[in-house]
A protein has these predicted regions:
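Two-component system phosphorelay core
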Residues: 1-106
Length: 106
């Protein structure tokens, strides 16, 4: 939600940049870990990393990304790998869009 992000930026001032950098770095690492775990079907790792990105994304208002990560988390809990690569690809695309929006606010 762009309005929420603008509100956060106005509220946090200079600390908003640090928040964005931390979010981007954390999500990049978690998504990298999840991608590796998907390749070898380590469902507990997939679940953990998807949960982390979901929570961080909700906190900054990236609800679409949080929803996709929730779907991945559910698949991992059920050890359901049907279409998991396609879902992960959608997550990566959504994260790229979120990252671009955040960087545009800096």
């Amino acid at each position: 939600d762009l309005h929420m992000l603008e509100g956060l930026r106005d509220l946090l001032g200079e600390k908003f940049t640090q928040l964005v950098e931390t979010y981007n770095s954390d999500c990049e690492q978690r998504l990298s870990n999840a991608g590796k775990a998907i390749a070898v079907r380590e469902f507990s790792v997939i679940n953990h990393e998807a949960h982390g990105v979901k929570g961080s994304s909700r906190n900054i208002g990236a609800n679409g990304l949080a929803k996709l990560c929730g779907e991945l988390e559910s698949k991992a809990k059920a050890e359901d790998d049907a279409n998991i690569e396609q879902l992960f690809s959608a997550i990566e695309q959504e994260f790229a869009a979120v990252k671009q929006k955040l960087n545009n606010l800096l």
